[in-house]
Amino acid sequence: MLFKQLILVATALTTLAVATPAVMRRTEPASSCSTGPVNCCNSSGTAKDGNIAKELALLGIVVPDINALIGVSCSPITVIGAGGASCSSQTLCCEDNKYNGIVALGCIPVDISL
């Protein structure tokens, strides 16, 4: 009897896992970045991520949406498609870049490939 219940629960969980859509971050073309230059960031994550949370706390930054994408150690890519503009890390378009590249808030991944 216990074995049947275990099989039933396992089947239900498997069905739920298959039916649940995966969370996907959208990627925008670089031309849609209206907040300034596209940034090349060493890493990105959310305010829930341990290292990012520590960095935000040290800077005294309170993020209203803990699920919003945050760029870390960012520098602007000023000329996209001009041959020299490249980023081996993550390219992001961010709304709030006033922290001297340490962090950038409200980011969306962008595609700089042509």
From Swiss-Prot:
What span is annotated as the signal peptide, if there is one? Answer: 1-19
Subunit details:
Self-assembles to form functional amyloid fibrils called rodlets. Self-assembly into fibrillar rodlets occurs spontaneously at hydrophobic:hydrophilic interfaces and the rodlets further associate laterally to form amphipathic monolayers.
The chain's disulfide connectivity reads 33-93, 40-87, 41-74, 94-107
Q: Keywords in alphabetical order, please.
A: Cell wall, Disulfide bond, Glycoprotein, Secreted, Signal
Give GO cellular component annotations, separated by semicolons. extracellular region; fungal-type cell wall
What does this protein do, in the record's words?
Aerial growth, conidiation, and dispersal of filamentous fungi in the environment rely upon a capability of their secreting small amphipathic proteins called hydrophobins (HPBs) with low sequence identity. Class I can self-assemble into an outermost layer of rodlet bundles on aerial cell surfaces, conferring cellular hydrophobicity that supports fungal growth, development and dispersal; whereas Class II form highly ordered films at water-air interfaces through intermolecular interactions but contribute nothing to the rodlet structure.
Main localization category: secreted
| Pfam families documented for this protein | Hydrophobin (PF01185)
Q: Where in the cell is it found?
A: Secreted; Secreted, Cell wall
**Would you tell me the protein name for this molecule?**
Class I hydrophobin 6
Q: Belongs to which family?
A: Belongs to the fungal hydrophobin family.
Cross-referenced InterPro entries: Hydrophobin, Hydrophobin_CS
* Annotated CDD domains: hydrophobin_I
Q: Which GO terms describe its molecular function?
A: structural constituent of cell wall
